[in-house]
């Protein structure tokens, strides 16, 4: 009996220790980031449901076509979370070169066997899945850049060739992306890479050369392609040709104008009824403005930029703990998400020419949604490892 009592008396302590361990691991995850992301996912799903029914019925004679695919993507993201949240960041640092090579191979393959939509070869079809290599290219580039800076940060600061090496990788990817063509992703890659190199302490003179060459290249690319010239001219004054090159932008502006401050109400958009092209993907923000108004649009942008600033904060904390790869990866994710959001919103409001970029976490698109989710998993894992390192630095005293 005494033996049984002793055995049973130890069990509660073991159970308590197990509970405390699991609970502490949960606390070590950034719960604010989790809830913000889940909130955006919910808004994105609701808006895809609202915007995709008309076009699903018209093209596929099934009003739930895009909705079913979106739900499948969320289920896939849920499964991927078990892998990425449990994988140490050091794994991605060690294999960053392999991931980069895979993404470049995919960029080559999409030009050879890719599926064309609106004249752009951006998708590889594998069964019912449509893989967009340009989305994979973003996260692979930032993993490579962070890995390079963790090894060669002094070389980047003191040597032009150390600065130019990561830029040469981006240039190689950009040439393949422009062949699709996908100028929007090229702009995002260049801006994010230059911003992260600036954070690493690279000299201003090095940026001057790269930025000058980049601007001249973009101008040349616009002048060489007639459709890009038309895009720039239609963005400059879309009302000059409202039923031609300026059609999409004028319909987008009409949607935003109809929304006013409070919006027409969820599901009450008129522009999504086959007036505004890509209402469920690149131009979903216009329908958000129409249905939820300026206030709803502002709140959604506030959440996205809060996530971006949170990423920068996580990166700063990691760098303070000498976790160089983690720090630069988190910073690159924050810059990428905020810059891509700015370009998307600028395009649908007529501030910038259209670039074919999605609104992160909101627009329909499996590759975009999955890659954005993986970026969040990276942030959560980086924050987890940083907090774990901090907690281990302060050992508990004897009980």
From Swiss-Prot:
UniProt enzyme class: transferase
Catalytic activity, as annotated: [GlcNAc-(1->4)-Mur2Ac(oyl-L-Ala-gamma-D-Glu-L-Lys-D-Ala-D-Ala)](n)-di-trans,octa-cis-undecaprenyl diphosphate + beta-D-GlcNAc-(1->4)-Mur2Ac(oyl-L-Ala-gamma-D-Glu-L-Lys-D-Ala-D-Ala)-di-trans,octa-cis-undecaprenyl diphosphate = [GlcNAc-(1->4)-Mur2Ac(oyl-L-Ala-gamma-D-Glu-L-Lys-D-Ala-D-Ala)](n+1)-di-trans,octa-cis-undecaprenyl diphosphate + di-trans,octa-cis-undecaprenyl diphosphate + H(+)
Pfam families (alphabetical): FTSW_RODA_SPOVE
UniProt-listed PROSITE patterns: FTSW_RODA_SPOVE
EC number: 2.4.99.28
Entry membrane topology: Multi-pass membrane protein
Functional pathway: Cell wall biogenesis; peptidoglycan biosynthesis
Assigned GO CC terms: cell division site; plasma membrane
Protein name (database record): Probable peptidoglycan glycosyltransferase FtsW
Gene name per UniProt: ftsW
